[in-house]
Amino acid sequence: MQKVLVVCMGNICRSPTAEAVLRAKAAQLKVDVEIDSAGTIGYHQGNPPDARSKAAGEKRGYSFSGIKARKIRDEDFVKFDWILAADKENLAELKARCPQSHQHKLSLMLSHSDSEYQEIPDPYYGGERGFELVLDLVEDAAEQFLLK
């Protein structure tokens, strides 16, 4: 079974949304995969996803059950087969922390899609449309990633 970790900064908007979407898409496509999410900072550790992210995702039928924010741990670089970053800043942070022998596991989530976007924009300080855009980008990338 492949293990996938999705990472953003605080693990309350983008990466938990990606976790929820990947779980649902994997179940639909009958792909046996373990999915988790984390943040590069631990400020929101133990908190549920941002209410706006959760509301947008639930409107599309995704479950955020059991998802709580956590900071990435050193053992994650060993445990997971794929570590997908939401943006270049978080990818750089991951590359700085990741042992050389596991660097091949790191990539931008959107590098696995046909999107014109390279990064998933952080919707935290924006309006509702930002959360919808995150879902649009993540849905496309999740399906393409799982079908590879």
Where are these regions (language model features)?
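Phosphate-binding/catalytic loops
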Residues: 82, 88-148
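Helix N-cap/beta->alpha junction signal
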Residues: 15, 87-88
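Conserved active-site segments centered on acidic
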Residues: 1-79, 147
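Hydrophobic beta-strand core positions in alpha/beta domains
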Residues: 6, 84-85
